[in-house]
Amino acid sequence: MHALVPFLLALAWDLTLGEPPAKLHPVVWFGRIAGFIDSRYKRRSPVLDFTAGLLTALVVITFAFLLSIVPFYAPFPLNYFLAAYLLKSSFAIKSLHEHVSRTITDDIEEKRRAVSMIVSRNTKVLDEAHLNSAAIESLAENLNDSVVAPLFYFLLFGLQGAVIYRAVNTLDAMLGYRNERYEFFGKFSARLDDALNFIPARLTVLLYLPLGGRKVPEYYRLARFKINSDKPMAAMSAVLGVWLEKPGVYRFPGKEPKNEDIKRALRIYWLVVTGWVIVVVLLLATGVCPCLSL
């Protein structure tokens, strides 16, 4: 089974139908497995908590791997459908656009509600400019997490790479917090997610270069606050020319972000996505990438 066919099917699925129903979404399954174990494990000590978190991650990753090889054993043409379905579940192009688009409103309370759906910070204490910033930051970060990274691992390792990456990213989203409950239980998931995103986050920055020129590397040098997630944010800030800030954590310089800048950010998002999709198609079609078949 040539990998290009399931990719094109998955891409068409994403752009037309969007996300599968929650009950049938592999990402939801990953989250439910992790949540089930998390809710039943009583915290004991740093070593035991870390070990339990590691085992939780291994359970979810093993499930993701087993799920990803199902198409290998399915008859034609069901194998193509299953491969496309699982691959589509690993990335989210249309859904990310829709979530960020909802933050474009002059109603401050509606904007707070929309932004709260895509960031973990307390939106009730944010003014309009910081709400706009948070929306753009989320778009930039998730361009890597939800588009570039899963397809990067698809190119390297096929369907298994994309699905396992999404499982790890889901684990980090659920368990990768630095608080009393997850400091040790979620540490393995958080560090594994950092490792897997190291190259894709920087690849995402490169995809901004045709749009931002020399400003992109200038802003990239300012991104010293986090291992990965601030790199795409810096690139987006450079291209837009607006400041992006999480108070007390990081700030990239520029003019105050407005509603119009979220619209501009979405246009930039689609340009970067289009460029990345073209790269993926060319690598799959020409045989340059290491993984040509599922």
Curated annotation (Swiss-Prot):
Annotated TM spans: 52-72, 73-93, 145-165, 268-288
CC terms in the record's Gene Ontology section: plasma membrane
UniProt entry keywords in alphabetical sequence: Cell membrane, Cobalamin biosynthesis, Membrane, Transmembrane, Transmembrane helix
Subcellular location: Cell membrane
Pathway(s) where this gene product acts: Cofactor biosynthesis; adenosylcobalamin biosynthesis
Keyword Secreted among UniProt keywords: no
Topology relative to the membrane: Multi-pass membrane protein
Disulfide pairings: none
Gene Ontology molecular function terms on file: ABC-type vitamin B12 transporter activity; threonine-phosphate decarboxylase activity
Keyword Cell membrane: yes
Example of a GO biological process term: cobalamin biosynthetic process
NCBIfam families: cobal_cbiB (TIGR00380)
Family according to the record: Belongs to the CobD/CbiB family.
HAMAP family: CobD_CbiB
Function: Converts cobyric acid to cobinamide by the addition of aminopropanol on the F carboxylic group.
Name used for this protein in its record: Probable cobalamin biosynthesis protein CobD
Organism: Thermococcus kodakarensis (strain ATCC BAA-918 / JCM 12380 / KOD1) (Pyrococcus kodakaraensis (strain KOD1))
